[in-house]
Amino acid sequence: MSSQGFMSKIALPYAEALVESASSASALDQINQDLSLISEILNQSQELKTFFYNPLITTEIKKNVVSSLFTNQVHSLVIRFLLVLIDRRRIALLDVIISKYLELVYQLQSTVIAEVLTPVLLTDVQQSALINKIKDMTNSKTVKLVITIKPMLIAGFIIKIGSKTIDTSLYGRLKHISAYLNAVS
């Protein structure tokens, strides 16, 4: 089993518990926004990520930082959840837990998550057209795009929906041609 699969197995019960708590508190949308904010903060601050993932830093210090950073910024349920993760020494799985949480919520709401890798930022018109195309392909009510800029793709884009990948990038085509030429020679 890959380490990513192992982490996903550990993260899933936490994500399920958070979905259940958020749903019973009628706060799914608020929790979604708060977790997206936290995920964005962690992605932008490598120091904060390293701090939370460092096992040598005591749980009390981590709890104090969570309280000072997020009190009055995010829903109290999110703060309590983060404190539980710190107590159980699972805060290092926060990225995976957030990802699993969002997957579960989107399943509840019949939303498809499409990860889009592109060399440049897509315009609103392009995003809208892509969303409509993905809705048609997946028969879903709504589509959530997670866009990542990857300049190495040169042109085109890669779309990942679940286990399905659609690669229309120039990088992917060149890689395919290279593999073909290596197999022939």
Curated annotation (Swiss-Prot):
Keyword Secreted assigned: no
Cystine residue pairs: none
One Pfam family per UniProt: OSCP
GO cellular component terms, A-Z: chloroplast thylakoid membrane; proton-transporting ATP synthase complex
GO MF, any single term: proton-transporting ATP synthase activity, rotational mechanism
Localization annotation: Plastid, Chloroplast thylakoid membrane
Membrane topology: Peripheral membrane protein
Keywords assigned: ATP synthesis, CF(1), Chloroplast, Hydrogen ion transport, Ion transport, Membrane, Plastid, Thylakoid, Transport
SUPFAM superfamilies to which the protein is assigned, alphabetical: N-terminal domain of the delta subunit of the F1F0-ATP synthase (SSF47928)
InterPro entries noted in UniProt: ATP_synth_OSCP/delta_N_sf, ATPase_OSCP/d_CS, ATPase_OSCP/dsu
NCBIfam families noted in UniProt: ATP_synt_delta (TIGR01145)
Quaternary structure (record): F-type ATPases have 2 components, F(1) - the catalytic core - and F(0) - the membrane proton channel. F(1) has five subunits: alpha(3), beta(3), gamma(1), delta(1), epsilon(1). CF(0) has four main subunits: a(1), b(1), b'(1) and c(10-14). The alpha and beta chains form an alternating ring which encloses part of the gamma chain. F(1) is attached to F(0) by a central stalk formed by the gamma and epsilon chains, while a peripheral stalk is formed by the delta, b and b' chains.
Family from the record: Belongs to the ATPase delta chain family.
Function: F(1)F(0) ATP synthase produces ATP from ADP in the presence of a proton or sodium gradient. F-type ATPases consist of two structural domains, F(1) containing the extramembraneous catalytic core and F(0) containing the membrane proton channel, linked together by a central stalk and a peripheral stalk. During catalysis, ATP synthesis in the catalytic domain of F(1) is coupled via a rotary mechanism of the central stalk subunits to proton translocation.
The name this protein goes by in its record: ATP synthase subunit delta, chloroplastic
Gene: atpD
